[in-house]
Amino acid sequence: MKRILLAEDEDVLRMLVVDTLEDEDYIVDEAADGGEAIELFQNHPYDLVILDYMMPVYTGLEVIEQIRNTETSKHTKILMLSAKNQSFEQERIFQTGADYFMAKPFSPRKLLELVEGILNGEI
């Protein structure tokens, strides 16, 4: 069973994403800020980390930097969610270490399709 870490500070969106992923039998750990995300990542192996760009404590970019500096992150895929979808922002996201990007707003179905593609090695 695949394990996913979701870090999103918007409660309603976080619950929607968790429900969508858990309905497909993914194990989802959730964090409401970047600090919680880093703590969870240090204590559990994840197949995928989904991060919001703008969060309290640490931004999504800062979380990526922390994750990519650990030995255990080599096989972990990172998906960044952001309303900042200008090309220069996306370039910065990828340069920091994200593997995938999805612009907000998005439908739960589209997110699920992307997550399944990532975890099945199709994307």
What positions do the PLM features span?
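Conserved acidic carboxylate
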Residues: 8
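Charged docking surfaces used in two-component/phosphorelay signaling
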Residues: 15-23
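Acidic, metal-coordinating helix/loop segments flanking the phosphotransfer/catalytic sites
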Residues: 30-48
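Receiver (REC) domain active-site loop signature in two-component systems and cognate sites
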Residues: 55
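C-terminal output helix
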Residues: 106-115
